[in-house]
Amino acid sequence: MAARVCCQLDPARDVLCLRPVGAESRGRPVSGPFGPLPSPSSSAVPADHGARLSLRGLPVCAFSSAGPCALRFTSARRMETTVNAHQVLPKVLHKRTLGLSAMSTTDLEAYFKDCLFKDWEELGEEIRLMVFVLGGCRHKLVCSPAPCNFFTSA
């Protein structure tokens, strides 16, 4: 079963946040502890980083009770298709990261809610789950062997 998260716009930071639904994480467990987490320079991430969470490759802010700065959850199959007839999701998000105009936050929010989450819950695509930084987040990744890449496949 895929982790259940809700999609919320944080107007103060102008980012799209994915927050866990309920009090505990439902992600797949991985063997071994995460170990000590790097201390971010920003005070926006409290000490309750929640190292017990089980998804690999998340930035430190993902473990904050305030939620991650901005994350994109997708599947390998979705990476190969289009958001709509005109835009490919990785390119759209990469443009957004560079500060170029692309898809609006409202459109992204609708895409997450209507496409990705529905597929995970109905089709059980948890095994192909990938995690990417959406952009604007300066927090370091945890347990990630290589820098985040928008075009990485599962």
Swiss-Prot record:
The similarity comment for this entry is:
Belongs to the orthohepadnavirus protein X family.
What cellular component GO annotations does this protein have? host cell mitochondrion; host cell nucleus
Region Mitochondrial targeting sequence, as annotated, extends over 68-117
Q: What is its main location?
A: host cell
Q: What is the lineage of its organism?
A: Viruses, Riboviria, Pararnavirae, Artverviricota, Revtraviricetes
Keywords (alphabetical) are: Activation of host NF-kappa-B by virus, Activator, Apoptosis, Host cytoplasm, Host G2/M cell cycle arrest by virus, Host mitochondrion, Host nucleus, Host-virus interaction, Modulation of host cell cycle by virus, Transcription, Transcription regulation
Q: Where in the cell is it found?
A: Host cytoplasm; Host nucleus; Host mitochondrion
Its function, per the record, reads: Multifunctional protein that plays a role in silencing host antiviral defenses and promoting viral transcription. Does not seem to be essential for HBV infection. May be directly involved in development of cirrhosis and liver cancer (hepatocellular carcinoma). Most of cytosolic activities involve modulation of cytosolic calcium. The effect on apoptosis is controversial depending on the cell types in which the studies have been conducted. May induce apoptosis by localizing in mitochondria and causing loss of mitochondrial membrane potential.
Q: Does the keyword tRNA processing apply?
A: no
Check the record and name the InterPro entries matching this protein: Transactivation_prot_X (IPR000236)
Quaternary structure, per UniProt, is: May form homodimer. May interact with host CEBPA, CFLAR, CREB1, DDB1, E4F1, HBXIP, HSPD1/HSP60, NFKBIA, POLR2E and SMAD4. Interacts with host SMC5-SMC6 complex and induces its degradation. Interacts with host TRPC4AP; leading to prevent ubiquitination of TRPC4AP. Interacts with host PLSCR1; this interaction promotes ubiquitination and degradation of HBx and impairs HBx-mediated cell proliferation.
**UniProt keyword Transcription present:** yes
Q: Pfam families, from UniProt?
A: X (PF00739)
**Example of a GO biological process term:** viral genome replication
* Identification of the protein by name: Protein X
Q: Which domain of life is it from?
A: Viruses
Q: How is it modified after translation?
A: A fraction may be phosphorylated in insect cells and HepG2 cells, a human hepatoblastoma cell line. Phosphorylated in vitro by host protein kinase C or mitogen-activated protein kinase. N-acetylated in insect cells.
